[in-house]
């Protein structure tokens, strides 16, 4: 915990309050500087932390139901503080092939290498692969096993206090909590060895992972072999199960991922997104979001 400073906790407060400044709980926390110092003292002294969640079911625009875990703002500040404390080792181990919830990476990222859409276009346009293998982990957050994640933590960090705090904030009653700042980080930590397995063991040159959505490009035989080796690796090493409908597919059928359908020479926005775009275009907030999608195409 030698990196813990009041300035680091202050930065954690800034990070935690982004996009939440209008909430009463956040306003009350920010009005009293003592709240910030109490978090610093609590972590400095190694005092126990308890994170309580309330749960809310949300339905995404494509009809998918999720249970979101909502914690207090103070708990989110603690999570962001821990994330800053472990940032150096975490960032050093991240693969260049993962793109979600990482600063400087994602759709429309300023650097082409860290934009998954432009990366997929580059792979298809430059290397002309026979086809692709698109994989999705079944209930990734819910099926994450604590003992596996904590073993991954222990392989990276040796500070017992940090490890104990990570154990306290990483899980809720239903697995990795959807909606907390620490969960995407933990999911990447779970998949770090998998990313190396794809590159070093399977020798897959063209690979993109966005959270638990995985796509590999190559020839038919290599993709068939990769499917079964990946399924075995995920199950026996991480306790994850793939959805059953994955199979190598030729590029002429198009690649439907990340809201786009990729073809050799051109890219289209997914049909369901175009239909939602037509219905929501008059809403200025929705329009700006959809303009970002159109920019990617």
Where are these regions (language model features)?
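Conserved polymerase palm-domain catalytic core
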Residues: 36, 43, 118-211, 215-230, ...
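Glycine-/proline-rich flexible loop or hinge segments
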Residues: 15-27, 58-69, 96
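Right-hand nucleic-acid polymerase module
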Residues: 44, 71, 76, 80, ...
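Conserved pre-motif C helix in the palm subdomain of viral-like polymerases
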Residues: 65-95, 173-201
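Non-catalytic, polymerase-adjacent accessory regions of viral genome-replication enzymes
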Residues: 1-38
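Active-site-proximal segment of RNA-dependent polymerases
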Residues: 83-145
